[in-house]
Amino acid sequence: MNDMTLYLIIALVPLAGSLIAGLFGNKIGRAGAHTVTILGVAVSAVLSAYVLWGFIDGSRAKSDENVYTWLTMGGLDFSVGFLVDTMTAMMMVVVTGVSLMVHIYTIGYMHDEKVGYQRFFSYISLFTFSMLMLIMSNNFIQLFFGWEAVGLVSYLLIGFYFKRPSATFANLKAFLINRVGDFGFLLGIGLVLAYFGGSLRYQDVFAYLPNVQTATIQLFPGVEWSLITVTCLLLFVGAMGKSAQFPLHVWLPDSMEGPTPISALIHAATMVTAGLFMVSRMSPIYEMSSTALSVIMVIGAITALFMGFLGVIQNDIKRVVAYSTLSQLGYMTVALGASAYSVAMFHVMTHAFFKALLFLAAGSAIIGMHHDQDMRHMGNLKKYMPITWLTMLIGNLSLIGTPFFSGFYSKDSIIEAAKYSTLPGSGFAYFAVLASVFVTAFYAFRQYFMVFHGEEKWRNLPEHHDDHHGEEHHGLGKNDNPHESPLVVTLPLILLAIPSVIIGYVAIEPMLYGDFFKDVIFVNADAHPTMHIMKEEFHGALAMVSHSLHSPVLYLAIAGVLSAWLLYVKLPHLPARIAQAFRPIYVLFENKYYLDALYFNVFAKGTRALGNFFWKVGDTAIIDNGIVNGSAKLVGAIAAQVRKAQTGFIYTYAAAMVFGVLVLIGMTFWGLFR
């Protein structure tokens, strides 16, 4: 089997499973649908691991080939091809591995779903295929198709419960916000096609870069901008939409309207990592624009800190994890801005495992609570759900960067990258990610203590407290006890907990300080020496652990955990008093900085009002009543006046003839004596 055949199988097997489950779901039944899709993703995952191992042991080389050309237009070829190197192989394993866990978990989570079971499995396999096509692409056009495909399938999955108004609003919101980002992304691709040698293949674009290094473009008359900077920023606008960076982040928390398994897949391994992967893949372009890198770093820092603040006040267990995703995506974006692309991709990998674990553990707790998602109704679940408790604890310890857990190595590396960066804005970025350490630890363990410790709060609730939480809005009765989830739910938790602990220790040496990304990621060490400094300062996992003992990061995390314990275990009455004392800030956080209100009332309603204006004034008044109907009325009015001259009396016609003759005589004399 040659390489291209292998890569085609990896990409197409999930698509085949999706089509079978989607088109023949009624014939093969629920068991047939989940069997065929799980089998497809499992084959893809095993083969992806085989590909990655080939790069690790040196038996596999980078591959960049076109599979076929599907359109030729004006000398430009639009091809489907695969670029498979170490970064691609790592992402293939992450995407298919997490997707496999989500597929297995879904059997238990969606067990009681009366309709849409086969449809859901079809969607998540299609999601996996779309992401694989995105990360394996060797050209911008295929990248864009994969980019749009994950956006489309996320729309279908977020709105899976399409009879629920909040779900249809959420998926439309996600779709429209991403269209804003995708418009910028498409403009960036257009500039690449127009100015970077007339090719959309990555290797051709990168080879042409020296020819446009000093090129400028006029966005406005008389104002020259660096062509590369404008291209980088437009491409990054696309990344801001897909990877939910401020201010295009507002769709991500609402994606919780979809079932929990898809929340894990979107937030951990697929859609939100697409933008980060794209920027890392385009590192040769971004390294030529320090301005673009500074903008990226500052936006990432804003997202990391200010989205973390919003996680502090959430009461929905899934939304806490969602805001942690936003904050962690901000961390990764800071790393990209610091030219630490390998660090960003390292955190993409570690984050995928512990974030999928956190979402699926949250889903297990939701199952135990009979689909009540409000943490204020939980408490002491540790007693009833020990596997869920332990795996959630592992996920949170990795999230906050506890030494020896996977998240520690990647998260601390990002903080160090911001510290050593010399770009404008790096000081703010370092402060933001440092402050976010405390905030992350606080909201992560606030969630942990509210759910797994303290009083069993559901026993003090009215019998019907299922007003707006959960997928089916049930909730435990006063005398009910939660039960541990079945093996099909807990097994993925256990399997995801393993890399959440060890993958950082195993991978940090080759990915950050070795040559794992050699000839894949390009860094201009003279202009952006961050990684060079880090390689001199640290020499592996144990050196980072030793360094953490002298760093404020560890102590900020400990302070965050202790603060959460104090407020939600020892003094549970205090948070309400603090919220009341700082009411304006609480209201600001509760309204999410009023960005949703701004977008809805200004942009959405403003666009609708503008549309109504053009409809009523432009279309109805001017075109319909003015030009179309008005011209008909004008002709009718003229005809009516002309008709009055048709009297039927001969003397009227004789007078008209005399008048006409006089006019002709007058014109003749005018011509003779002029």
Model-identified regions with their sequence ranges:
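Aromatic-capped, Gly/Pro-kinked transmembrane alpha-helices
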Residues: 75, 80-83, 509-555, 565-674
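Transmembrane helix-loop-helix hairpins at membrane boundaries of multipass inner-membrane proteins
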Residues: 1-6, 24-122, 195-224, 229, ...
